């Protein structure tokens, strides 16, 4: 995703929201948002260090801290304890819980919306574009997330690197739209 989202430039989120996911309750601290990519960390973000297919997020903690991360979320690592100068929040099954964590962190933005999913082999971009245009014509606020990017109110705001964005990007985008 290529964007400066609202959560990264002005809002603050309490880490204690993540207590139900963590092995121990995080200290009372605040972060501006969640980020999976250490290269995209902005000061005040929490770095979510997930083990991927090719790379392990734990290897990028130092880079995230150097870029201004104010907390790290990661799987418990009992055989290889991690020491950081910032809060380190251990969350079992982090990758599997990421959607629920992001939804909780951003105050469940989809609860304030009607969500429609469009699937299939062909025609998804056209179909979602038509739905968005219809909503606009009928004066209903709408947004589309897809191949071309995310469009709140049919106005391109963010470019996407993937057709289906990660859970954090989806939840933070929905939170931005909720707060428009």
Task: Indicate where each model-derived feature is located.
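Phosphate-binding loop of NTP-binding sites
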Residues: 7-9, 19, 97-180
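N-terminal leader/targeting and accessory segments in enzymes
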Residues: 1-100
């Amino acid at each position: 995703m290529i964007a400066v989202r609202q959560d990264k430039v002005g809002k603050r989120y309490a880490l204690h929201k993540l207590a139900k996911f963590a092995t121990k309750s995080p200290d009372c601290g605040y972060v501006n948002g969640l980020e999976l990519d250490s290269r995209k960390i902005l000061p005040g973000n929490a770095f979510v260090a997930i083990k991927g297919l090719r790379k392990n997020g734990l290897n990028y903690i130092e880079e995230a801290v150097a870029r201004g991360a104010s907390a790290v979320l990661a799987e418990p690592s009992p055989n290889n304890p991690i020491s950081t100068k910032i809060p380190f929040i251990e969350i079992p099954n982090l990758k599997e819980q990421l959607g629920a964590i992001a939804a909780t962190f951003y105050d469940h933005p989809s609860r304030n919306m009607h969500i429609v999913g469009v699937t299939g082999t062909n025609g998804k971009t056209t179909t979602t574009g038509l739905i968005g245009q219809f909503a606009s014509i009928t004066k209903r606020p709408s947004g589309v997330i897809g191949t071309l990017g995310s469009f709140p109110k049919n106005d391109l705001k963010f470019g996407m690197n993937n057709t289906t964005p990660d859970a954090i990007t989806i939840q933070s985008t929905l939170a931005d739209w909720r707060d428009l």
